[in-house]
Amino acid sequence: TPGLTITGPCEMMVFEGLPGSAFDCWKDILRPDQRLTKACELLRRFVPWEAELCQKVKLTDEQATLQGSYTPVVKKPTFRLSYGKPVLGLGDSILLNDPIGGQGANNACQSATFFLNKIKEHESRLFTEEWMQETFETYWKQSAQWATKWTNLMLKPSKSFVSLLRAASHQPNTANWLANGFDIPRKILTEMDLNE
């Protein structure tokens, strides 16, 4: 992935690992140079054709690496401010999916649009905590649950989904259809037949 750092343009690598997998190895690797060494080892082991492209890779600076973990969660969508008024959260403040599914910005945009439309429909009535909870539940059923299912499918792909990914690697129409599924996971998931 192309990037820009304080020292200029660069190419970035992202490694994600399920707990207990070979890629779940970063917790005790603290120094950036050690992280780069481990990244190159993983490339050589799992994707040697990519490792060939990284033979001369080097860090741009001492802050060139970032490590962390991510716990997907659906939070309570409402919160009470210190003076008692309820507020409705949206996007990552209430719904966290693993980044592998590419749904963070998608959920933020879709929830903002959905909630705005519901606010307009509600007109001048009170925006109670109950209304906010119901609005979120409707959003979950119509949109957000599909983003979560899509992300979970990426994390633990079925054999059928792996076959679909393989097909997309050499069939442009399938690749385009699959890539467009990131925008509207509900549409693509209802179109896919991934029965094992």
Language model segments and positions:
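Short, solvent-exposed loop/turn segments at secondary-structure boundaries
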Residues: 26-28, 100-104
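Conserved FAD/dinucleotide-binding core of flavoprotein oxidoreductases
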Residues: 1-68
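C-terminal helical "tail/cap" subdomain of flavin- and related membrane-associated enzymes
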Residues: 60-64, 80, 101-103, 116-196
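FAD-binding beta-loop-beta segment adjacent to the flavin cofactor pocket
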Residues: 67-95, 99
